[in-house]
Design a protein with these regions (language model features):
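ATP-dependent adenylation/nucleotidyltransferase module used to activate substrates
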Residues: 9, 20, 24-168, 176, ...
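Short, hydrophobic-biased amphipathic alpha-helical segments
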Residues: 35, 231-234, 238, 245, ...
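Catalytic subdomain that performs nucleotidyl-dependent activation
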Residues: 85, 156, 164-244
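Short, solvent-exposed polar/charged micro-motifs at secondary-structure junctions
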Residues: 124-127, 231-232, 262-264
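A short, charged, Gly/Pro-tolerant segment at domain boundaries
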Residues: 248-273
Length: 273
């Protein structure tokens, strides 16, 4: 019952805070209150979750997907919306990473877990020898994840993209594709009938790092050969440089993406109740 009070006001919240037993627990609660509050706003703004949904969470084992998994499990348990969550992990690395932390976290959260072996990295790096492997790898991973989600009877797939991911994608599209584009908060896939949702889009990478550290989330270390050497990393460094000069730049860029009064790239995602 304690977690539920993080998202409400009044006496219940005051009783919850009074029940805290030490400063470390207080700090963890503060982090998760902020994360869950931002996720709730995003879900409500774009109508991401409905009663009866069965949501497959794509879990790589990194900080973003592990926090998403944890937050969605809490959301399921304490928000009064009846929906199901399951985790799907594609084991794509060369060498194969240790995904024990994913399985253990799922067991703790009472979330079904599928660890699916895959030859995606073999295809991308050893057969195709891609010079820019990220796009093909992402496409293959999305396809495999969606296929498993359909097989398991899921109607939605949740991905751990956060605010910085959206802004970096926007910059990539401008500078390398010559178009104004980023991924949508909600995407409906005609081929599979699935809906892809991104509940963490109102949360910064810095906030995710802080929450993952405070919650002591176990993280699977990436074994990707291209890690840290991508165009996306260039955009991350560029965005950091911009924000050193303009500290509010990230928030204003996010506001621009959803500015319905002028040109909102995400406007078509909103639905009237």
């Amino acid at each position: 019952m304690l977690y539920r009070t993080w998202l409400v006001k009044g006496k219940a919240a005051r009783y919850a805070w009074a029940a805290l037993i030490n400063a470390d627990q207080t700090e963890r609660l503060i982090y998760m209150k902020k994360i869950l509050g931002a996720m709730r706003r995003c879900c409500e703004d774009f109508n991401m979750i409905a009663p009866g949904d069965r949501i497959a969470v794509g879990v790589s084992g990194g900080k973003d997907s592990m926090l998403l998994l944890t937050a969605l499990a809490m959301y399921r348990d304490h928000m009064g919306i009846p929906f199901e969550v399951e985790a799907i992990t594609l084991m794509t690395g060369i060498p194969v990473a240790d995904y024990t932390p994913v399985a253990e976290t799922c067991a703790r959260l009472n979330v079904p877990c599928t660890l699916q072996p895959s030859d995606i990295s073999e295809i991308v790096f050893n057969r195709r020898h891609e010079k820019n492997p990220c796009a093909l790898c992402a496409k293959l991973r999305r396809g495999a994840l969606n296929d498993i989600a359909v097989q398991h009877g899921c109607n939605k797939v949740a991905l751990g993209h956060h605010r910085d991911d959206a802004l970096e994608t926007f910059l990539l599209s401008m500078f390398y594709e010559g178009r104004l584009h980023t991924f949508q908060p909600v995407t409906r896939l005609d081929r599979t009938g699935l809906t892809v949702i991104r509940p963490l889009l109102y949360i910064s990478e810095k906030e995710i790092i802080g929450a993952a550290r405070k919650l002591s989330l176990p993280i699977v270390q990436s074994t990707c050969p291209a890690s840290g050497e991508t165009k996306r990393q260039e955009m991350k460094e560029m965005l950091n440089a911009i924000c050193r000069q303009i500290p509010t730049a990230r928030q204003y860029m996010l506001n621009a993406l959803k500015n319905t009064a002028q040109y909102g790239l995400w406007d078509k995602c909103r639905q009237d109740d």
